[in-house]
């Protein structure tokens, strides 16, 4: 009988995990290559980092963000999935327009059919407001990269992913880079009502 060596880096001391997920990072050699894929408008809109606790997921997410923030015409948005994610996203988009003086450029672009709301509080932003912001960013040839640390499967997460499904359906320019434990990512990917993560990962 062959005595197999146990992996010293596995806190379960060699026990097989209940869930085995494919390596979604396998196409990328480094954080820089992830940023390059985004810069070249890679059609894969979701990049997921998964692994055991303490495996360096957050550190890798941070390294990717540091590379992405250097890209031209790209805005980074950090979303806390313990808060109201849709409203938080809307507030971040409003700040992009204000901080980067994009409001000065809006006048020269047709906005027939919708308006942009800059005076709302976090709680007041709707999915329509967000679609309007994102539509304007597309007209300005800008992209948004959303970063979420410790992604999990909760009601506010479901609401946020449903919003992303709508944004993708309207061909709006965004990417999602997230990290999470294997069980959490599995639950999100296999939620029957959320087709966007499964199609994108």
Where are these regions (language model features)?
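Hydrophobic core positions within the conserved protein kinase catalytic domain
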Residues: 35, 134-137, 164
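The catalytic "switch" region of P-loop NTPases
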Residues: 2-16, 142-145, 156-201
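Amphipathic coiled-coil/heptad-repeat helices and related helical stalk/stem segments
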Residues: 31, 126-130, 160
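A short, basic N-terminal segment
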Residues: 1-44
């Amino acid at each position: 009988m062959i005595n197999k060596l146990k992996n010293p880096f596995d806190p379960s001391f060699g026990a097989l995990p209940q869930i085995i997920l494919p390596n979604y990072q396998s196409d990328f050699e480094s954080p820089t290559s992830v940023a390059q894929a985004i810069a070249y408008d890679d059609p894969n809109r979701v990049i997921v980092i998964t692994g055991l606790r303490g495996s360096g997921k957050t550190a890798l997410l941070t390294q990717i963000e540091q590379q992405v923030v250097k890209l031209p015409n790209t805005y980074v948005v950090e979303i806390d999935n313990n808060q109201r994610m849709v409203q938080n996203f809307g507030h971040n988009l409003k700040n992009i327009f204000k901080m980067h003086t994009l409001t000065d450029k809006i006048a020269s672009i047709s906005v027939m059919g919708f308006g942009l709301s800059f005076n709302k509080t976090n709680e007041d932003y709707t999915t329509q407001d967000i679609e309007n912001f994102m539509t304007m960013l597309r007209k300005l040839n800008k992209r948004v990269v959303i970063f979420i640390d410790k992604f999990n499967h909760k009601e506010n997460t479901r609401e946020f992913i449903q919003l992303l499904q709508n944004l993708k359906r309207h061909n709006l320019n965004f990417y999602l880079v997230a990290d999470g434990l294997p069980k959490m990512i599995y639950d999100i990917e296999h939620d029957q009502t959320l087709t966007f993560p499964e199609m994108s990962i």
